[in-house]
Amino acid sequence: EPTPRSFNGDKVFRV
């Protein structure tokens, strides 16, 4: 399940 994480002010979905 991909978890939404904030990176550099952008939301990136990583598994």
Swiss-Prot record:
<comment type="similarity">
    <text>Belongs to the peptidase M14 family.</text>
</comment>
<keyword id="KW-0482">Metalloprotease</keyword>
<keyword id="KW-0865">Zymogen</keyword>
<dbReference type="GO" id="GO:0005576">
    <property type="term" value="C:extracellular region"/>
</dbReference>
<keyword id="KW-0964">Secreted</keyword>
<protein>
    <recommendedName>
        <fullName>Carboxypeptidase B</fullName>
        <ecNumber>3.4.17.2</ecNumber>
    </recommendedName>
</protein>
<feature type="propeptide" description="Activation peptide">
    <location>
        <begin position="1"/>
        <end position="15"/>
    </location>
</feature>
<keyword id="KW-0862">Zinc</keyword>
<keyword id="KW-0645">Protease</keyword>
<dbReference type="GO" id="GO:0004181">
    <property type="term" value="F:metallocarboxypeptidase activity"/>
</dbReference>
<keyword id="KW-0378">Hydrolase</keyword>
<keyword id="KW-0121">Carboxypeptidase</keyword>
<dbReference type="GO" id="GO:0006508">
    <property type="term" value="P:proteolysis"/>
</dbReference>
